[in-house]
């Protein structure tokens, strides 16, 4: 049974305009610790905008996003402190092309979490081992397949020890034969109790892993 103490993210009256176009029309949602919220909907429904508002990659026009008890949409809040607790995985991987896999992974922990290079490297190698990519640590992103890049992007986000992972259509840019390897990593994360918000078209994943499946249409949650 969940209680108010379990709520990690609470969204109240979330609105987002792009010019005169109202993309989000007052969304309310609760994400509890350990939840896997799967967000589905047609292209242009507002689902990716909703996800990107959760860590203020898109600045909401109105509403509250309460994360760990703090309204991060308040102008007095240091959003960067809270972003560190939110891992983000994009459709296009967003790895730094001029850095090896390992350097991509340890950059955040060393620069932002002030970990030693040795500690960050040890943790990064353990995570790469978990996703079967320890032998690619010294390769560059251009040497990896799309599925391998996305697995690296996921464990790179995990290196920051996030409280929640946000996935914006993580498999939609992949060749069909590579989708499974990425979903497998995400399923294991869910099994380990990671709180996740996933925008996806993968209905099998939604049914198997989602604790809460929400359908967004024209900027509102029409079903959950």
PLM feature segments, named:
Residues 6-9, 15-224:
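ABC family nucleotide-binding domain
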């Amino acid at each position: 049974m969940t209680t108010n103490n379990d709520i990690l993210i609470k969204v109240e009256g979330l609105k987002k305009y792009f010019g005169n176009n109202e993309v989000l029309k007052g969304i309310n949602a609760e994400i509890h610790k350990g939840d896997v919220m799967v967000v589905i909907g047609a292209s242009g429904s507002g689902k990716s905008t909703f996800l990107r508002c959760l860590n203020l990659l898109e600045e909401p026009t109105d509403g509250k996003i309460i994360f760990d008890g703090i309204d991060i949409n308040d102008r007095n809040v240091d959003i960067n402190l809270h972003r560190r607790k939110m891992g983000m995985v994009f459709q296009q991987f967003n790895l730094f092309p001029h850095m090896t896999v390992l350097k991509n992974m340890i950059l955040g922990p060393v620069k932002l979490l002030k970990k030693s290079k040795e500690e960050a490297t040890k943790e990064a190698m353990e995570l790469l081992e978990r996703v079967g990519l320890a032998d690619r640590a010294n390769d560059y992103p251009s040497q990896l397949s799309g599925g391998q890049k996305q697995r690296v992007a996921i464990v790179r986000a995990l290196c920051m020890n996030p409280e929640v992972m946000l996935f914006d259509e993580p498999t939609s840019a992949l060749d069909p034969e590579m989708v499974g390897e990425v979903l497998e990593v995400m399923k294991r994360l869910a099994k380990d109790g990671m709180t996740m918000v996933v925008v996806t078209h993968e209905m099998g994943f939604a049914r198997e892993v989602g604790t809460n499946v929400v359908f967004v249409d024209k900027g509102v949650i029409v079903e959950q």
